[in-house]
Amino acid sequence: MPFLPTAAYSIHLEVALDNIPNTLGRLATAIGEAGANIISMGGFDVRGELLVNDVVVNCRDEDHAAAVVAAVEGLSGVQLLHWHDRTFNMHEGGKIEVVSLAKVDDRHDLSMAYTPGVARVCMAIHENPALSHELTIRKNTVAVVTDGTAVLGLGDIGPAAAMPVMEGKALLFKEFAGVDAFPICLDVSDPQEIIDTVIRIAPTFGGINLEDIAAPAAFEVEEALREALDIPVFHDDQHGTAVVVLAALWNSCRLTGRQIGDLSVVIAGMGAAGVAVGRILLGAGVGSIVGVDRSGAVYSGRDNLNSAKAWFADHTNPDRKMGTLAEVLVGTDVFIGLSGPGLIDAANLRTMNPEPFVFAMANPEPEIRPEEADGLAAVMATGRSDYPNQINNVLAFPGIFRGALDVGAMDITENMKLAAARAIADSVSDEDLTSTFVVPSVFDKLVPYRVAEAVAAAAVADGVCRA
């Protein structure tokens, strides 16, 4: 099934048209016949016998964009003056900047912001180091740290190539929750180097967001940093995903009248996210969970288990089910996919209990397309923005860090994650809850602040806030 045109492959065309009837119509027809979508037209400017126009077009991929450009260039009465890839254009020069909060308009301002006045603040922090969380950027700043070993669905592409993703993460922190974040892309080859480096730079930040670090190193890095630092450390690929999955599962149960404790769940993919999803579902009361990796079902005592999978095996699959994904899916209620494309099909869904919940979150191509699950799944969710019910971490991480920073949390506990999931779930009202709307829109500006409030309260209740 071909991909649909998407904003990820959006192009901007500046064209000059013969100012006669039907030229614009022929241009629109040519773009449509090439299989692209016109998103907007504007900038109409009459220049003598020419009409100059800006056209924004969504394409399927780079080859398709080139074909659309060729189709436009081949039209009589149409001159292509200029075109560019809008995604690359957005990234030119980066997506974030450092902005001053204090104005320095005269020597009085300068004396307070810098020398000699700044020395007083330095000495206050020297005498009471906790003041660094009030009198410096630590109060509102998070490091987004990666080694570039597991970037999106691209794999180990290295730290430099990971930078656009980390910049994007920093942008989302700011846009959705007002948290200042800065990308830290580390050229390292060993998990211990990540740990040592982050410990050394930690005095600059109020929190650490680990991102796109391959498992099992991700587990080791997060555990070590949580033990070593007195600021919150959060591996978003694990816990952000887990929080939003739980929110979607709670609302799927609310929609269908089921109880989460009665569900039998299969998780395909035992990387960082899969293990974290299993952990949070256990905390939410799900009793029957079976994980599946490339070797089949994960069970206690199985060979080839790293420490994270061994923990998972010891706490799930009480019946020690064995076999392939297709075999363990039979008679279950929930499929959660965190693996790869086309892993299951409609025939697999028919072996599950009636009207299962299907969360197929592999990107860019899910384990099963929603079209194939139509009529079989009670709720279908993916990780994609072009289908309903997008399981998107941006619903979780901005609000989680906002809440943690606001109360000076030194850790992010399981209760804080559960509180975040509940806040996300409760952001969908009973009136709005449908099979195609079990999680709120990422553009619901209230969600991060509901999450922040819930996380802050949980942090206080758990006693992890700085005195």
What does each model-identified segment do?
Residues 1-92:
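A conserved regulatory-domain signal marking ACT and ACT-like small-molecule sensing domains
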Residues 24, 135-136, 152-154, 194, ...:
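Short glycine/serine/threonine-rich phosphate/pyrophosphate-binding segments
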Residues 80-263:
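Glycine/serine-rich phosphate-binding loop and adjoining beta1-alpha1 elements at the start
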Residues 80-83, 183, 209-212, 233-236, ...:
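General beta-strand structural signal in soluble alpha/beta enzymes
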Residues 152, 159-177, 229, 235, ...:
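Glycine-rich phosphate/diphosphate-binding loop of Rossmann-like nucleotide-binding domains
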Residues 232, 236-237, 258-262, 360-467:
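Adenosine-phosphate binding glycine-rich loop
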Residues 310-379, 384-386:
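Rossmann-like adenosine-cofactor binding region
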